Amino acid sequence: MHRQIWSIAEHGPDYVVLTLNLPDGLGGFPGNRDIMLRYEIEQACLTMTATATSDAPTPFNPANHSYWSLDSQPGYGGQQLQIAADHYSEPDAQLMPTGRILPVDDSPYDFRTGRNLAGDDSEFYDLNLCLGATKAPLRPIARLTGRDGVCMEMATTECGLQLYDGGTIDGRDYPTHHGAPYGPYAAPALEAQSWPGSLAHSHFPDIILRPGAPYRQITSWTFSAKQIG
């Protein structure tokens, strides 16, 4: 969907509503799909509400793939990440889920109490952290704290969080606010979604969007700052 042109259906001083219509068969997926995204800012909180309908059963597991750079300094080494996940989906050598759900205890994926990120190839993160077995009411699930003291608290209704370290970022064609393109390990991505791989593993949460049962996701990012030093 990131390569599609969305329409602005509505907008105001603190919000925008985007819509997208995907015809049956586009991308190899069945169903005419109507998707709506609402982004709204209230004080220091950005909230995304995603809804979708389909006139035929179809796989549907969207995720916001924003990269989060909270510092004025390059890279994200030394930033602290905390994630409320007790388990993760084991990936194989091709990064596909094996179907095994493993505890994060004594693994590189235990972020429950917070850990500093290296932000380089000494670490590797591209996997799903399990926040639960089903959707839930909006609740805090992750916190990223930058070296300059900027904090981002992420909340979501989703049952999974894909953590990606940004090791293959190639932004040569996309100049940034600073004028220089982003490269590998410029920033991590925290992607709220259902567990990837559910079509191959029946014990994973269901991601089929069915007629009469609209999809709905709420994810928010709240920012604050603390004194460093």
In which residue ranges do the predicted regions lie?
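An exposed, glycine/acidic-rich loop-and-rim segment of catalytic or binding clefts
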Residues: 1-229
